[in-house]
Amino acid sequence: MLRSGAASASSGGGRGPSSSLSSVKRSKHDDTRLPEAYQQERPPWRPPLHPTAARRHVPDLFPTKSGQPEDDMSQISVRKGFAPRTYVHNEYFCAHDAIHTRLLSPDALDTLSDWMDEVMQRRRELDRASIATNQYKPPSRVTLNDAKLANYVKDLADPTVPLMRLSRSVPHGFRGEKLFEMLWVGGALPSTATAATTTVNYFHSRIAGPPSASSASASASASASTSAPRKSVDIPRAVWFIRALGAAELSSLRNKSAATIIPEITSNLCAWMAKQVAELNLVHTAESNSTATASPAPVSPSTHLPRTPSAAPSSLSRSVAAAHFARTPSNLNPASSPSLAPAKEVCYVLQNDADEERWIAKWSYSLSLARHLHAQNLLDRSVLVRWIVDAFSASNLVQLPFLLELVQEVLLLVLRRRCFVKPFLTALLVQIPNVDARLDPSSSGGLRTKLVLLFRIVCENSPESLISPRLWFEHSASLTQLLNELNAETPLPLSHQAFEFVEQTVRPRVDRLLLRPHSGNTTQNASLETQETLSSPLQHHLDIQALDSFDMTTIDRVFLQNTSATHRYAKHDRDDTVWATRIDTILTWACTDRRSGVVRQYLAATLIEKIRFGVPWEESSEETDQVSLPAFDLEHNTTKTRKINVEPMLIKWLGDVETSLNQKLDESSTQTRVSLLATVDVGAIVVLLGELARRGVFSYTKYLQRLIARGMTAPSASSATEQHQNPDGSVQTPSSVSASRDSLHLRLLRSLPLYDQPASVYQQRRQAIYGDRTKETYEDAAQRRALRQLQSFLPFAFAQEVQAEASRIAVSPSPSTPDPVHALSRLWSASRFVRCRLFRSELLPAVTARVERLNGDQLSQISAVLVMADDFEGLAQLLATLLLRPLSDNLARAAFNMVIEYSLVWRSMDIMATLNQLVRQQLNHSSSIRNDRQAVMASTTLLRLRTLIENVPSRISASALDPGADHDALQQHVQALRPNVDALLDRFAKLTRSSVESDGSIASSSTPVEGSDMLTPFRSLFVQPDAMSDEMIERTIVDSVFARSDTSLVPSAVRLIDQLYLEASLEIDERHARWLSNLVLSIEQGTHSDASMKALLSLLTRLIAHGTLNLQLAMDTFLLPYLLSSVRRLTDPATRNTEVPMHIGSIVSSLGEIFASSLGETVPATSYEDMRAFGAQTKLLFAQVNLPSLLRAATCLISAFDETSTVPASEKAQIESFCNALLQSQPMQIAFRQEPRLCILAIKDTCKSMWGCNPSRVIDLAMACLDPTSLLLRDVGTIDAASVKNRLDGWDTAVVATELVEIFERLQLVESSFQTRADSKTKALASGIFDDLFVQLPDIGAQLVRDCQSSGLVSRFTDIGIKILSDKVKAASTDADKTPRRMDNSHKGMTNFGPDDGADAPAQAKTAADAAKHGPCVGEQQVESTLRSVVRMCEQQHSFIFNATDADSCAQLLLHVVTSLEDALGSMAAASHQDKVARLVTVLHGSMTFQLMHLVLRFGCLWNGTMRALALRLVKALLELTRQAGEKTECGGSFALLLDSLSFVLDELPPTLLSTCLPELETQLQTIELATQERSDKLQQLSFRLDNATTANAWLVASSAGAALKKGWFTSGGLNPWECAEYLEAPPAANPAAAGAAGAAGAAAGGNARAGVVETGRSGVNSRAAVESPGAVTVNDAETCNSLPGARTGWTGKLWLNTAIPLSMLGVRVTRDLVPNYASPASPGGVSVGSNDASSQPWTTGGGASAIGVGTCSAMDMDAKEALAALPMFVESERTYGERSAGEPAYSRDLRRGLLVEPNLPCRTRDERGETSQEPARATMDPAGAHTSVTSSATHDPSHVIDLTWDADEEMPLSTHPHHPAVATTSRKRRLSKRD
């Protein structure tokens, strides 16, 4: 380099004269001002090249001097040349060639240019931070009109206009949405008239407008073509302008601070963006072919270019992608949506290409502006995040993708606070089901996947947000579904852990807040306690309700599952005393006359058998693997193990019954149980004990021996005489029983049947009853006479083969068939013992031997005898015998009908599954032999059994009749077919009659054909017969019979329709429904005679009897619609007196024939087979799914025979008789006891549909038949609480709840003059029955509230419950005050807890509850029972907020809660540590305080304006309890429960009261420090504020993101949004007094806003002066600052923007001028931090000349490796260097060179006990900030320094680090290589 420099000098010397001449000329012109002499000095900012370089040395410049080596002209120098001395010792050659080659490269100039640009930019970056304080001047404000304001914004949008000119003044009053809209438009806002023109102008260069737009008008086209398209303000200039506006506002308004300006800017921006989102609304439009498909999406997102260069392309692409998605599903066309609506939903903005591009560009500009404002801390995070969450929650399907992008950008902020994450989680649970319902997965575009992913992120990162009672109450189904989806997608171990977390952690805590018992607690002790706490009245009511339901699943759950499923082998199950009361209830229910039906005895016997052996009751109508007949096998009980000995209970119950029967009525009237047992029917006892004996539960032999031992079998003379005089040994009525002087046991001994007993037992029985009698006994004579009558009544069963064959040929019995009641009088007068022995020894063997010769009617006649004798065991044996063999069609129909008709008996006997399987075998057999008729009957039987067993509707989907064009066309075809069908029907009827009249044994040529051939003539009327033609034939046949009024055509029509039914498909019910509905219309529209109606009803009756027509279908589509229309004309005053023929009498006659079997009539109307068919069909009408239709028909009949009806008196009597018999029948009584509320509602709804009908009177008439003791039969004014309580005895409790609903509704519907009296009556009645109805029988109270349709009545009951609860709480607290040391006694012995009470919370709760028993716990038990009752009552409202109006009682309860919490805090103030833990557990689990609070929070009337102080006290008390629990390590469970309660309170507080509590809450949260960081984080999530400012550790300041990321040019520290380096004065250094003030909203302005003084705290904004080193500004820097031009002199370099950048974006970047400086006392600006959470450490600021001083916290939770990773990183530039060494601090130089300094970590010391502990190192700073030292509780080891420059093999000598006084000794083996 020297040689090239000399050559240049010599070459320049050749041009010396010219050079001197130019110097002379320059001296002449500049003689007055000579230039300064050049000084060879480097600039002050340039670091030296090398530590050994001269002070004034300039690189590559060597001036001549005397004695220099180049002047040596010796011989050696001349011969060998000059060898220059190397400037650096390790440089051995010249760099001229390398430099010359580099300069000759093609890109040399570009490279040099880039280097110079970087140099200039770097100097500008460094000089920007050195602007003097007096140069920060805010601009002045001016008020501009609209035109000038538009011009100002236009200039702002023009990049060529310098900001210097715009900065001279700032518009005043320019704010709101108008500000952002003008920034977007880039000038004046377009008016309404020119809005379209502006849009066209803007997109003129991009989009070709439609042809109509160009030809609209000449002026418009001219203006559009001449006006230039507007351009939005660039994002950097827009941010500068907004900041300038805020700075001007701060400087002009004294009372305004950044805390108010920033939220205002944020609110305006959110409102502006909300208007844009609102443009994407969905509009319903008519579907058309031209718009059926969606608008085409853009080809690629690249067509939508950003309007400003600063718009981020990534955000724009996301917006375009979202827009592309939002276009397609917004149409919701049939191709992409399952909706069948004729209209579609479209978004007009996205349907138009121009509007779409305008909206997307504007939205992209909004997002870019929002991001930059947020980066500059010009937006309030809390306001912004809250708006985004609210907008996301209220968005539709089109808006959802755009708001989803916003949510993803602020998701981390959302997860930080519960006030954001809870509404966001609620929004997800609403939006995901909405997307599922509106969009299919193929068209959702991954939207649902994104939503589910967000749900998963929320659940994983903020699991505490799941603990929300309202969330689980309102969105339980969606939440459970999504959690199950997440578990399915997660691998098995992780999914199992997630499932356990939800079930074991989340659900118990949520159930605690909802006051629900957690289902997961299934321990034995808990179940025993539950059974012990179940009151006897409630258990009695539940047992009777289960028995009345006749639902085997319910009976199994109430009686068997509690004892056999979970604790099958518990001692409690084998305790006979526990079951004594329940067995007594079962026996009484089975035999009392307060219930009806022999089925009760069979159900009770089966249930007692299962209880005795401890087996569950399993019932199913589905197919089983094999056929088993356990009910017919009497040996199966011998293999079972007895668990309960029920025989002593039976004997005791029989004794009580006998005592009750022998007492007088007046004596037993005062005793409830005695009066109840007096209603027991002895005949029912005989059936029950006989069934128990057959099942092996009751031993007849032991019973007989017991009676013989007690001498109760010796007959008296009077009794023997009485036997001959009155041979009725069965004694079927209570009156005859009481007339007998024999004991009940002796009568039972005579009547009980014997099943498969040996002859010795019969002989012993004869000896016990008749003694030594050798003659024929009374029973033998009765059996002989009854057998003779039975053979006479059933000759086909006992006759010879010829006679049986003759009886089989008969189609129907002769009209002179005797009445079975009179024909078998001897049989009915005999005892049950005689009847059962006669059936099993004579009847059943004879029938079984001749079963092939029987027909359906004969089988039905035999079954009628067995049913009248209540011998269902014999009938079951007969059915099993029949179904086990192939049957004829006639016999199979009768057998199937008996299976359906007595299905309830078979279910009670637990043989339904066996019979069901036998029917299924018949179906398989008939299908295999292609017997279609029998297969159809078997399949129909299985479907009807499923309806009866499982309450599943049968396969009927009959649609309403549509009187449209299709119906009219079909009717025209039917009318056209009538003549031909009439002729064919007459011919077929004539053939049928001739075949019947002729002898059956002689084949007649006139006999009609069978099968499909009979339909051939009818089908020949059509060219191509099909299903529609069959329907026309069927309808024409029915119309012909109806129009011709000829009953002789009915048999032929039945045969034809039956054949059509047999050949029809599964849609036969729909076909029948159509022509039945057509019949109703034709009857209503025309006048038909009674003969026609009777012929039609006869046809329908025969079709029902034949099984062709479904009675349920006929009721729904014909009978009920016709009755409703007829009765409406009767009740309507306008049509009541019109002369319209009514056929109600004919319908009632047909219904009487159909319901004869169900009403208990023994004389058949037509035949026994028809009775069985009608009975099977009517049984379906009494099923729960079909019962409303039957009750509606009964309601119509009641209205028809009412006093105001115009029906003739003769018909009224007939209708009333049938209706009363129907409502009093056994099936109706059973159905009414099953669902009393369903019956009342069906009657009431029917009455409401008929104008002029009185619902109350109709209900009273119906209840007189259903329940003669009903309260509704009394006057409402006479009903008091005592009468209601008398009915609440368990037997009528469910009915009472239904009656009370009707009573309260009637009290509300009184006249206005009696309204006050009715209200008083309602209140008195509700108050009087509240305890009995809601406390003792909570299920009935809950049912009452559930059935009430009046919200006012529900709120009244709720108010009464709250008042009673408040009174009991007050009484309990008064009793507790009498014993002030109650709490001290309650927690004695509770001081020895484990490390964490969260793992043993149930045990501690039980301990606390046991300890509380030392005090007066009676009041607390009453409070608890009342509380549970109120909760159960309120939960029936099906809303999270309970409807109530008693605000005073609610306030009293809340005041009690707050007082209890404050008392608990006071008692814990002076207690010891263990005492505090015990008291805390007692407050949580040993009292009702928190349960009361959780209940009161759900009342809607609780909060009002007067509750501010009480709400604040509640929050403070809960927060203090939470703090105390969090500070104790062993109180983890208590802390979680208290945190849940506090969160619950904050969630339910209204905004007006929440604003009162927030200041105190935020203040306490800033000062609370808990035991663990995890608890602190959980508690901090309750805060409602987001820190808008950032700490110096996490943020940097740079001119742009590119400068920071690419060049690494930035300054550490947060950005003050109002510290505008261009116009605001720089704030001074913070003082210690101001260091503690926190700026929560981003920056808190000081007293002098003009000077820009900002007070910052540990989480506030850190100004630039606060992070600069005290020695950063030197003398040379000051001179440089003074030499720079000011803000008013036009320096343009200062107009670069400040941008705050998170440090995480930079990563770890090490450059020459930016060296990562880890915290160390050796560094000039270093700090020592022991935790990553900088916001949780106390900050200590020194004097004005000091840098930031940061205190440290304990590092006991981190080991050495974690502590090293926890050290924060700071980046220092040349401006902040302290002591320099070659341009960088010595510490940074050593770190770069590889000198590894061990950080100051906590050292391990040993205490006196020998345990190892950790003591943290702390960095302290004196007030002057002169030096920093490290102090610790123990002496540290010296830090070892490894110098990689030491190459000697020997050991490195000890040296002292210049800034780190640490000595290190090491060898070469420990040196790091370059790779390391």
From Swiss-Prot:
Residues 1373-1387 have a biased composition (Basic and acidic residues). SMART domains: Med12. GO terms for biological process: positive regulation of transcription by RNA polymerase II. Residues 1867-1876 have a biased composition (Basic residues). GO terms for cellular component: mediator complex. GO terms for molecular function: transcription coactivator activity. Residues 1-75, 291-314, 715-737, 1373-1405, 1801-1876 are annotated as: Disordered. Keywords: Activator, Nucleus, Repressor, Transcription, Transcription regulation. InterPro entries: Mediator_Med12, Mediator_Med12_LCEWAV. It is found in: Nucleus. It comes from the Eukaryota. Residues 1-10, 1394-1405 have a biased composition (Low complexity). Pfam families: Med12, Med12-LCEWAV. Component of the SRB8-11 complex. The SRB8-11 complex is a regulatory module of the Mediator complex which is itself involved in regulation of basal and activated RNA polymerase II-dependent transcription. The SRB8-11 complex may be involved in the transcriptional repression of a subset of genes regulated by Mediator. It may inhibit the association of the Mediator complex with RNA polymerase II to form the holoenzyme complex. Belongs to the Mediator complex subunit 12 family. Component of the SRB8-11 complex, which itself associates with the Mediator complex. This is Mediator of RNA polymerase II transcription subunit 12.
